[in-house]
């Protein structure tokens, strides 16, 4: 008998393929007897390139088509696991699916990218009315608080497409905002003009980490994933996802986070913000908690902070955003 094959699913974009192959290598390094193959698929989020993400909620934009293949009738098309950018993965998965593991986190920050020919080095340099390209309402809402004189316009497409739009001499954008991790994974770290930290902008829940989705209760896959996943990223991201789930936010709403786990003290510091779309109202808070049971305590940390923020008005902000989306 030959080696057992594992089918790994992911999106078709260049970044998604790099991420799927990264997980393939992690598995094959620990389990050389497995023959891993990557299967790619276009998702609804890939197909709808002309509308801002904010306008249609986006809770399963990047996942559903791939999930169908975890239970596919045809063995040649059936997947064993799916690799997602964790920030695109809904915090509540459909019945029959679960988050099997989280890989080591790459830089979770957002970053500013200027065109090759630009003399500007930061948002502070931009003139009044300068146009910032971003499809993320989380990014634009937070930046509007600090830079009310700038304009924010949607820019869709994969990383290469967005960079081409930015570098075009006729581009309407003075700059664009991207996730630092995506550029780093693609070998484009040289395009990062400036990284943002929480004094300017909190990053997305799960940003910089990969989430691996499996069939619920698949003990064989769980055993494999236990060997390739990262404790620090798991603690931070489980707390961030619990916060988002308690706030009932999808990946297209203005919830920003920053988390840090200290492996010596076993304490997790979680900071979060909820902002209205125009950047005029915000609820910001933080919590530090001792993590003794990885799953239970990490999730409790996020839930407690979210409940405090709801009491301070965060839910009201998010409910108004959802009402605007329905109109």
Swiss-Prot record:
Superkingdom field: Eukaryota
The record describes how the cofactor is bound as: Binds 1 dipyrromethane group covalently.
What reaction(s) does this enzyme catalyze? 4 porphobilinogen + H2O = hydroxymethylbilane + 4 NH4(+)
Q: Which parts pass through the membrane?
A: none
Q: Identify the Pfam families for this entry.
A: Porphobil_deam (PF01379), Porphobil_deamC (PF03900)
Q: Which residues carry this modification: S-(dipyrrolylmethanemethyl)cysteine?
A: 251
Q: Which InterPro entries match?
A: HemC, Porphobilin_deaminase_cofac_BS, Porphobilin_deaminase_N, Porphobilinogen_deaminase_C, Porphobilinogen_deaminase_C_sf
Pathways involved: Porphyrin-containing compound metabolism; protoporphyrin-IX biosynthesis; coproporphyrinogen-III from 5-aminolevulinate: step 2/4
Q: Note the PROSITE patterns from the entry.
A: PORPHOBILINOGEN_DEAM
Tell me which family the UniProt entry assigns to this protein. Belongs to the HMBS family.
Q: What does this protein do?
A: Catalyzes the tetrapolymerization of the monopyrrole porphobilinogen (PBG) into the hydroxymethylbilane pre-uroporphyrinogen in several discrete steps.
Protein's name in the database: Porphobilinogen deaminase
Species = Saccharomyces cerevisiae (strain ATCC 204508 / S288c)
| UniProt lineage | Eukaryota, Fungi, Dikarya, Ascomycota, Saccharomycotina
| Gene name of the record | HEM3
């Amino acid at each position: 008998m030959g080696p057992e094959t594992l089918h790994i699913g992911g999106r078709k974009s260049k970044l998604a393929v790099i991420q799927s192959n990264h997980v393939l290598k992690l598995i094959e390094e620990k389990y050389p007897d497995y023959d891993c193959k990557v299967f790619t698929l276009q998702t609804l989020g890939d197909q709808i390139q002309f509308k801002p993400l904010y306008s249609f909620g986006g809770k399963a934009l990047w996942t559903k088509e791939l999930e169908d293949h975890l239970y596919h009738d045809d063995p040649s098309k059936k997947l064993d696991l799916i690799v997602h950018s964790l920030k695109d993965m809904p915090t509540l998965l459909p019945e029959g699916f679960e988050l099997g593991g989280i890989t080591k986190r790459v830089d979770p920050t957002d970053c500013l990218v200027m065109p090759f020919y630009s003399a500007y080095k930061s948002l502070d340099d931009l003139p009044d009315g300068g146009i910032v390209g971003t499809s993320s309402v989380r990014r634009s809402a937070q930046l509007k608080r600090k830079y009310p004189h700038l304009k924010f316009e949607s820019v869709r497409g994969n990383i290469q497409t967005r960079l081409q739009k930015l570098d075009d001499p006729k581009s309407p954008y003075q700059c664009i905002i991207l996730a630092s991790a995506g550029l780093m994974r693609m070998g484009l770290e040289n395009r990062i003009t400036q990284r943002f930290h929480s004094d300017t902008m909190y990053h997305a829940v799960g940003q910089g980490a990969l989430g691996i989705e499996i069939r619920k209760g698949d003990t064989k896959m769980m055993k494999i994933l236990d060997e390739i996943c990262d404790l620090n990223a798991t603690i931070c991201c489980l707390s961030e996802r619990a916060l988002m789930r308690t706030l009932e936010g999808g990946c297209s709403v203005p919830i920003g986070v920053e988390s840090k786990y200290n492996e010596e003290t076993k304490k997790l510091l979680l900071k979060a913000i909820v902002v209205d779309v125009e950047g005029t109202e915000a609820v910001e808070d933080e919590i530090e908690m001792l993590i003794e049971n990885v799953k239970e305590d990490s999730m409790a940390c996020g839930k407690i902070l979210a409940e405090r923020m709801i009491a301070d008005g965060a839910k009201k902000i998010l409910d108004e955003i959802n009402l605007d989306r329905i109109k």
